[in-house]
């Protein structure tokens, strides 16, 4: 587009009360831009709304109730392996048939991921588990119990 008017310099010319902006108050506060923020969207800024924000007004979409939204709270098998003996001493886990049984759902987690090394035979009780985590646990003689999944 062709520039019709040279932009006024932002520099404070002359260090006077108005700094080149005419009457005192012409360049002060929000009167020069039609109000703070979204003021005037239904009045003097309506054309701007139609052009740049056509979906500003009206209802859009649906908000799910918070109780139906479940977050993924995950822990890695490497962390469980490191914490296993500590969890037994704190009575958050127990030993059964040579394995350390850890119920991650009682600790607030709902998924087990596969990062880290597994050195101890663990029996993990969880709501969901990644393929890699399951492989690592069973490779050292461990066991995985997924809540809601049929046992073979």
Swiss-Prot record:
Pfam families: Ribosomal_L27A. GO terms for cellular component: cytosolic large ribosomal subunit. The keyword Ribonucleoprotein applies. Part of the 50S ribosomal subunit. Belongs to the universal ribosomal protein uL15 family. Binds to the 23S rRNA. This is Large ribosomal subunit protein uL15. It comes from Staphylothermus marinus (strain ATCC 43588 / DSM 3639 / JCM 9404 / F1).
């Amino acid at each position: 587009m062709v520039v019709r008017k040279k932009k006024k310099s932002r520099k404070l010319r002359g260090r006077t009360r108005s700094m080149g902006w005419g009457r005192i108050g012409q360049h002060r506060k929000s009167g020069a831009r039609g109000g703070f923020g979204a003021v005037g969207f239904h009045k003097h800024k309506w054309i701007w709304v139609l052009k740049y924000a056509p979906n500003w007004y009206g209802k859009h979409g649906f908000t799910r109730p918070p109780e139906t939204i479940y977050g993924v709270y995950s822990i890695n098998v490497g962390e469980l392996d490191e914490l296993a003996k500590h969890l037994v001493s704190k009575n958050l886990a127990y030993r059964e048939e040579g394995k350390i049984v850890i119920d991650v759902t009682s600790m607030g987690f709902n998924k087990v991921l596969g990062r880290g090394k597994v050195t101890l035979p663990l029996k993990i009780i969880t709501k969901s588990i990644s393929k890699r985590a399951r492989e690592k646990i069973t490779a050292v003689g461990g066991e995985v119990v997924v809540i809601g999944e049929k046992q073979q």
